[in-house]
Amino acid sequence: MILQEQRRLRLWLYKSSLFISVLFLIGFSIVLPVDSIVQAIQSENNGFNTIIVIGSLAVFFVAAVTILIGRMLLHKSCLKDIPRRYIPVTNADLPHKSSRKMVIHNMERSKKLSGLFKTPKDPVIHPGLEPPARCDDPNTPKILPEYLNYKICIKSATDRLKYYGLFLNSASDDVKSSQTFTDLVKSQFIKGNHNKRQVQRAKDFIELYERIRFSGDEVSRSEFIQFAENCIYFSDLMITMDITKVGLGNISTRSQLSFNIAGSSVDRKLRKLNTARSNQISRLSSGQYPDITAFRYDTSNSDYHRQETDEDDFALDDMDYFPSVPPYMIRRNSTNTVSMRIPTSNSDDQYNLGFNEIGDEDIQNNDQIRRYMSNTSKTDSFKTVIHNG
């Protein structure tokens, strides 16, 4: 009670003294213009009187403005000494003890709540951007980098086609500037294709791409993953396609994965494969049955590890694209793949072995071939077998 009375007394003295000081300032300041006006009235020189009156008013105005601006600057300089994030928790700021305790208690509570609010209770997943791990669903495997912009990644596929001539990671020298991503998907996987499942998937791929690029809506994570799966599917499909197939004239199978075959370029090796295929057809027409054709790819930049599913949903099992009996794919290690085409019978009398030289490791005798065939002859020749080494 005594403290409050003392504060009131100090406040009253401050306000009263300030009021008296302002009155004295105004009184002393107004003396000059009043005296000048009185003297000018008594004088008979009107010009001189006018100069005195105007000069006294100007001096009074300048003095008033100077005092006002000085007061403002002094006030701002005093405020600068106070911290911007200053919280009044000291005895001098809050003399009331209970108020200080309440302020300190709420500050500690806010600190705890801020730590809890940084990690949301439920997953926060917005379309268009991959959420960070702390906001993502813990039951969902984290396969994409944080803050990945889905639409920019998908747009890069069309930019690579437009500026670099790359379609699904395959180089093309004859892509026209007027051809779009949709046009190439139609020409490569829909026109002339008798595989209904591939045609339907290509149509779904086009629909998904156009919805993502031109709908104006943000891309969801499920749509982005579906788009990426389709890109991988059709990219693998292009590698396993027959390059003589109608509709593939504009796209080269020179993948950006840098396939090097026995130290030669891809074009030379593909020409050898086409020549070998023609020789096989001529031998078949003459009654000679070539049993095995072996060739080797150096896949140092990719391991092509694919896992079979119940839906048989990857390109190697789409048999309608192969012009002849499909090959068995035997995976030996992470750096090479040997592809063989073998008849269903495993009788030794039927084998007329012919090989092409394939790089550093050559197959030298029939015993080695029979060991290869012993692993695959029990399987129907119209299936694909992949052994991981």
From Swiss-Prot:
Keywords: Membrane, Transmembrane, Transmembrane helix
Protein name: Defect at low temperature protein 1
Location of the protein in the cell: Membrane
Membrane topology summary: Multi-pass membrane protein
Superkingdom: Eukaryota
Keyword Transmembrane helix: yes
Transmembrane segments: 18-38, 50-70
Ranges of the Extracellular topological domain: 39-49
Key word ATP-binding present: no
Membership in a protein family: Belongs to the DLT1 family.
Job of this protein: Required for growth under high-pressure and low-temperature conditions.
Organism: Candida glabrata (strain ATCC 2001 / BCRC 20586 / JCM 3761 / NBRC 0622 / NRRL Y-65 / CBS 138)
Cytoplasmic topological segments: 1-17, 71-389
GO cellular component: membrane
